[in-house]
Amino acid sequence: LPLSYGVVCVLGLCLNVVALYIFLCRLKTWNASTTYMFHLAVSDSLYAASLPLLVYYYAQGDHWPFSTVLCKLVRFLFYTNL
C-alpha cells in the first residue's frame, strides 16, 4: 500500500501541477468543461498531497505520530476526493 500511494502521489502531484499551469497560464477562454477539469485537477492535487502522510503511517505499522487535527485533515482530504 505505501508503494502504490507513493507512486500515485508523485505522478498525481506532477501531472496535476502541469494541468493547473495549463489551465491558469495557457488557456484564454473557459467554458463549463474547462471549469470542471480545473476543479478536478485541484481536487486531485489535494488528494495527492495527503498521500505522503498516509505512506508514512502505513510504513510505520499503523502508527500516527502527528496531531489529531492533522489526522482528521488527512482523512478528510483522502475520503472527500475519492
Swiss-Prot record:
A Pfam family reported for this protein in Swiss-Prot or TrEMBL: 7tm_1
GO molecular function: A1 adenosine receptor binding; G protein-coupled UTP receptor activity
Residue stretches spanning the membrane: 1-25, 36-56, 76-82
Keywords: Cell membrane, G-protein coupled receptor, Membrane, Receptor, Transducer, Transmembrane, Transmembrane helix
Topology, Cytoplasmic side: 26-35
Protein's cellular compartments: Cell membrane
Topological type in the membrane: Multi-pass membrane protein
Gene3D superfamilies: Rhodopsin 7-helix transmembrane proteins
Entry's Gene Ontology cellular component terms: plasma membrane
InterPro entries hit by this protein: GPCR_Rhodpsn (IPR000276), GPCR_Rhodpsn_7TM (IPR017452)
Tissue specificity annotation: Expressed in brain, heart, stria vascularis and vestibular labyrinth.
PROSITE patterns, per the entry: G_PROTEIN_RECEP_F1_2
Keyword field contains Membrane: yes
Extracellular side: 57-75
Highest taxon in the source lineage: Eukaryota
Record-linked PANTHER family: P2Y PURINOCEPTOR 2, PURINOCEPTOR-RELATED G-PROTEIN COUPLED RECEPTOR
Family in the record: Belongs to the G-protein coupled receptor 1 family.
Protein name (Swiss-Prot/TrEMBL): P2Y purinoceptor 2
Native source species: Meriones unguiculatus (Mongolian jird)
